[in-house]
């Protein structure tokens, strides 16, 4: 099934093309407790850019079927999908099944555009209408799996079962246990011979909701407000349409993303998607919650999955999955960027973590210490304490050593710190020992651990009293911009260097490597300011 072969379910469902690259509909669930509130939500959904609304009548506190359905369907500003989800399929309705199906038949007679009927009762429902379904009304027969995502064969068999009921549209929603679950849904979706909604629920299933447009899904869901969702992992309409530029995603859109765990805090999608849009580049950039890098790379080996940024804790695992590694990344022992070479599909690993961080630290030192010759780094001879021996820690320790700094590596595990310290001719200590480590004044501190990252913004990797011997403190965390560590360092008189500088500078480099053209630097800076 190609994107162009997916029929609009009804001639009454008119969508302004507006240059969109797909016909995957954007549906907003409406889940208010009263009819009036639902009408307000529907108008809001239209303002936000939805193509249709799913009216979840199982959320209504008081429901008078004939009167309420007539108002909701006739006064809706968008085409309607009526869903009356029972508790046994994950909904709110806990009453008589005959009464529920009678309401569904009434919605059909009143002219809703779409009707959701659960697979479990589909044959019973079709028998009850005796072939009297209006041509305008399209029935979505749905199946929801709240435990896992089955094999491709099992999903394919489920499609056949649903199709056999006479469904106009197939809907299958499964649950993500691992991000690779999405690949199985994509495989079924792209080969489906009938209009199909195929979604994977949960945070690890986000990509199924966004890339449904790439693989020919009939529709995807976007919530009207953040947190008010009809299924786990649902993005907002604003995220779908503005952040991910959903209507511009096509079959040939190139997929990029940031690989990490956790990943919800990442601002990378804001920057890279804005850059792609500004440059007219046909790409999408996703947050990728990955448990196993190797499994992810194996599952998404298509030439359209072309580039990734790497963050905690996967910088080192990413390196192991590369076909070729640039010399700096090899020396550091971690990558921050992976690109699929178009000529042969090989995965190339790079490390650009160090670029922004070292430049920002040097700039801060020059500003506080006065001018130094351009040929000499202000880090030369300084004691540089690097907290964390992961990917970013390795990058900073390595480049600090190259700049002439005396490097001390502190990590939770002494052995890990020792391995890195030995590579840069430095000293190793544990993070627990660091609070009492003050051999001299004017030291430089670089935190590359995740301690203090949103949402645990009250945490700090080092107590305030231990910061008095540092002249400059850098924190690789950029959410929040002002971490507790930086606030307390400034109170102690140290010059602070924000993680946003490291983040933005590596973004400049990666955007150019992903797109082949220079990054729109001011746009990226503006987006970062807006989102931190």
Residue ranges of predicted features:
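Catalytic alpha/beta core domains of metabolic enzymes, predominantly
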Residues: 114, 120-254
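Adenosine-phosphate binding glycine-rich loop
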Residues: 365-366, 381, 472, 476-532
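Glycine/small-residue-rich loop that forms an oxyanion/phosphate-binding "nest" at active or ligand-binding sites
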Residues: 73, 80-125, 318-379
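N-terminal amphipathic alpha-helix/helix-capping segment at the start of soluble metabolic enzymes
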Residues: 1-40, 243-253
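Rossmann-like adenosine-cofactor binding region
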Residues: 423-497, 501
